[in-house]
Amino acid sequence: MKQARRFFHNPITTLLPIVTLCFVMSLFHSCTQSASNPNKDLTAEAFAGFVNEQYGLDADDIRRCIINLVKKDNDSTQTDWLARKLYKDNKRLLWIDTYGIGDKADTLISHLKNVGGIGFSEKSFYIADLENDIQRIRSLDFDDRANKINELMARVEYKLTKAYLRYCIGQQFGFTNPYKYLNRLDPANEDTTAKVKEYRHLFDIPMKRPDDDFYAKALNMANAEELGAFLCSVEPQNAYFNELCAKLATERNAKRRWLLLCNMERQRWKRTEANDNPKGRKVVVNIPAFRLYAYSPDSTMEMKVGCGATKTKTPLLTSEINRMDINPLWNIPMSIIKKDVAPHAGNSHYFTSRRYFIVDRNTGKIISPANVTSSMLRSGQYRVSQEGGEGNSLGRIIFRFDNKFSVYLHDTSSRKFFEQNVRSVSHGCIRIERPFDFAQYLLGDDEDEWKLDRIRISMDLEPKTERGLKHVSDTTKSRRLINSVKVEPKVPLYIVYQTLFKTSEGKWEEYKDIYGYDAVMRKQLEPFVASNNKNDK
């Protein structure tokens, strides 16, 4: 018989003819099964004449078996990639120790058995497979087929690690990565023949993602006495998540369960908050709700908004509102010039009726619409702008914040737009229903009335002060009193996408998945989700 290589060390090895039998003996220290076990309470003397190759543990063979599992593993999540990398790099085994499959595995499985409460399937975390295989090990139920001791040990080690990383990284940071699937959703152009596809960037919310430090901590915790506490700590510490989880526990309708699961996942994401506003103010725009929420410590102002159409979606982002411009000039984006403006090149009436003017970018000179062609406008050499004031597409005021998409919040010249229920029609910017009220909110309650009146007068609104009324009564005076106002301190802005949203009254409101983001997220979550969620009913 081939002598097994030394794998584990134990002071009672002198009682056994081979080191591996000592390890088998020590497996019983961790046996917690209450079922009848024919190998129960064995002593060292029981093994005195027992030499059987099927109990021979071989460290190298276990690692070879794990590498074979790695090669066959086609799971594509980041956590599965990390598990494969761990064993390819020949790092230490996490779950097998001197006492066999120790109690840390039981601690992990105990936590994993709760995944049904978050709508997930135990199968996605290999719970039944692990329990069966661990029971085999603890009962010495090996054979020469699929349950050889080294193959069984390798299988348990690898599946425990995959389940562990899936759970702790998923619960801490989210089981999906919106940077990947939302930013590879909409092609940047309609050229289907391009060798390298470019996509529109739709998600730019700063978030904390798992890094090397967290990964190292998770691996260290797998062997630590604090494993149970660590597994508790990675669970979402979020009141909204807990409320949605409680709703999931009583919800039986599959479609509504998916609605809950998608919005629970959004609560797992570790969004990096913008700088705190000293006055406790922040603005949230929820795209599916077509609403803006302006929060103050003691009140919330809500208003309707309009957002980007499905082909020109409003990007999700975090920023700070830092300025407002009154009667802004609109520099028309190149995408709109190419699609909507260039076909009218040479038509002077089209340009003058809309108060558009054309500027040569190189010389700064204004060019007559009659002298340009569509190819000239599409070349990028010419800027097309719309004069500020009445009739401007941006309305009478615009609210600016730093972002890489050239989007902003603004007024609109089409006030009836807000009578529509579905208001996804823009090229990406956000139209707001009550622009002056919003300006007043941003400036704060302690702002002087004359500044507010100058904004009102410049927007052709009725002034509120005697000074303002006197000014507008003099028809010789200009009504353009102010062009730009800084927002100090800056007010945090969050443009989000939540199809379940808790209002300021504490009520959960449900909204249509207008951009299809829930549907995309569902595909990402399906591998984890319990079968009773998967069929719409």
Per-region residue spans from a language model:
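Eukaryote-specific, cytoplasm-facing alpha-helical/coiled-coil scaffolding segments in long proteins
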Residues: D186-E198, M521
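N-terminal capping/interface segment
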Residues: F7-F8, I18, G364
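Well-ordered beta-sheet/strand-loop patches within structured domains
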Residues: K2, T32-D80, Y87, L165, ...
